[in-house]
Amino acid sequence: IDAFDMKNQILDKRIGTIITQVYNPLIASEVKLRLLEYYNDETEIYYVRAAGIVSEESIRKIPIYELDMQEDIDYLTSIYIPKDMNNKKDFNDLVEIIDTLRGENGCPWDMEQTHESIKNQLLEEAYEVIDSINNDDIDGMIEELGDVLLHVVFHASLGKEDGYFNIYDILESICNKMIYRHPHVFGEGEVNNS
């Protein structure tokens, strides 16, 4: 991954990742902040300088939080993040968990569910989100929004199994809708009020 393109990348912690063009402390700081969205600040990464140049090559392990504090950052600097299966869970993990639960050796209850059988639970979870908002309960919001997201991913898994749609169809649909509804941000339109 090019450090200049970090903001446009979705990192997958389940694979090793090389980030290039980490050539000054400002870029290193931006990369660090992006990595902290996916990894703990103590996660060890490899700081690589002058890879392949025998007399100058340097590779050392550092915690992510120290990335922009390295004194030898220059145009020959890259970093390598090893795969990390024990870190914070992310969206890909949720999709994989649901696929496992509905898979051949999964949970009998999850395997027998249909769009119809779980539709009322989705509505209940949405009401629980509203209750959490009304009670200014941040932890409750995190939990209940997670439950709503679980239902979205579960319905996407059902759609994939039926051959009608998958999670990426849902994501594409909502992204296109948000871009369409905001031409003043993503296009040529102007807006005079909110």
Enumerate the predicted regions with their spans.
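Long, charge-dense
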Residues: 1-3
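A contiguous loop/helix-start segment that scaffolds small-molecule binding in enzyme catalytic cores
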Residues: 5-88
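Short, amphipathic alpha-helical segments
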Residues: 22-29, 165-168, 172, 191-192
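An amphipathic alpha-helical micro-motif enriched in hydrophobic residues
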Residues: 122-130, 134, 138-164, 168-176
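Acidic catalytic motifs of isoprenoid enzymes
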Residues: 155-158, 172-194
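Extended low-complexity intrinsically disordered regions
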Residues: 61-141, 191-194
